[in-house]
């Protein structure tokens, strides 16, 4: 109808409505709905643009939660998908893996203590891993310590090498930030069998804090899935494409970890953030696949 009136400007709204078989009121209601829809889409895309500045790879489900939480925009998942697709804003996952574990070092290793455990609180199981970043032609490494219950990154260190002193710094950061209500309760430390985690100094630090030491049994990703998943999110959703100098890398990682911890909702955390669950200890949805039966970890720590 709008096209008709553009071609024939002398045709009145009443005449055009009669030609198409609907009333003038219905025409203006439809026009208003189209206008309101256009305004709503613009508002959604504007909010998505702001969110994506901090969370460049955030997907539809999490965007839906953040739009409602931070912008009071209630939009259906399918509608949001269509809006994002039409705007060319859908993202593809980046999947690459580089080996950072070298276990042929001859140092003592420890058994896997957590394959029969489902954590019931924060600071019950900490999982660790190392990921790499390619910066200005060099490989840099990020050492991460993650609370298994809340998925919160509680310790980290950026370095240009894989020595154990960097892993020690990440672990010390985790100790400094422990939730006070769990500080006197036992913690299991789970890692792969890399030399950093088997070194004399690192093991001494764990024992000084009365940690139970747990390690993977091999290359099975089921042995340390949470650490690998969190590392992948930090690296692929927040750090790539990595356009930063060596001097600015640590701050870039710091901002990425803050965005992940404090702003990104998790499906397995009832769409809460890791920081919220770590601080409050709220119950979580165990939506990841568990290959092992449930056991009380206090029996292991005694």
Model regions and ranges:
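Mobile genetic element proteins and their domesticated derivatives, centered on retroelements
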Residues: 16-17, 27, 48, 63, ...
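Mobile-element integrase/transposase regions
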Residues: 73-77, 81-144, 168-173, 177-186, ...
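Basic, flexible linker segments flanking DNA-binding modules
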Residues: 17, 24-122, 273-285
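C-terminal domain-tail junction helix/linker
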Residues: 207-211, 233-302
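RNase H-like two-metal-ion nuclease catalytic core shared by retroviral integrases
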Residues: 101-103, 191-193, 199-204, 213-235, ...
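Conserved, non-catalytic sequence blocks in retroelement Pol enzymes and Pol-derived host proteins
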Residues: 57, 71-72, 118-120, 135, ...
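A short acidic/small-residue loop/turn micro-motif
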Residues: 147-148, 158-163
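Short, amphipathic alpha-helical "recognition" segments used to contact nucleic acids or chromatin
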Residues: 1-10, 45, 49-53
């Amino acid at each position: 109808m709008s096209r008709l009136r553009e071609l024939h400007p002398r045709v009145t709204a009443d005449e055009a409505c009669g030609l198409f078989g609907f009333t003038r009121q219905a025409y203006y209601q439809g026009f208003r709905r189209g206008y309101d829809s256009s305004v709503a889409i613009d508002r959604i895309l504007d909010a998505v643009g702001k969110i994506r500045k901090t969370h460049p790879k955030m997907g539809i489900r999490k965007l839906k939660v953040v739009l409602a939480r931070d912008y009071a925009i209630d939009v259906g998942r399918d509608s949001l998908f269509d809006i994002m697709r039409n705007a060319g804003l859908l993202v593809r996952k980046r999947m690459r893996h580089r080996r950072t574990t070298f276990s042929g070092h001859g140092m003592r290793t420890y058994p896997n203590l957590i394959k029969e455990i489902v954590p019931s609180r924060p600071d019950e199981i900490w999982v660790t891993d190392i990921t790499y970043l390619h910066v200005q032609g060099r490989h840099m490494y990020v050492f991460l310590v993650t609370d298994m219950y809340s998925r919160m990154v509680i310790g980290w260190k950026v370095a240009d090498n894989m020595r154990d002193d960097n892993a020690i710094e990440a672990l010390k950061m985790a100790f400094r930030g422990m939730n006070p209500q769990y500080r006197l309760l036992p913690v299991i430390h789970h890692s792969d069998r890399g030399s950093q985690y088997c070194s004399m100094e690192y093991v001494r630090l764990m024992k000084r804090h009365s940690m139970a030491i747990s390690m993977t049994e091999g290359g099975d990703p089921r042995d340390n899935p949470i650490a690998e998943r969190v590392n992948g999110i930090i690296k692929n959703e927040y750090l790539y494409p990595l356009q930063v100098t060596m001097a600015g890398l640590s701050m870039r990682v710091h901002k990425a970890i803050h965005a992940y911890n404090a702003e990104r909702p998790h499906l397995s955390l009832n769409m809460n953030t890791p920081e919220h669950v770590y601080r409050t200890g709220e119950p979580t949805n165990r939506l990841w696949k568990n290959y092992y039966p449930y056991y009380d970890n206090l029996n292991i720590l005694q």
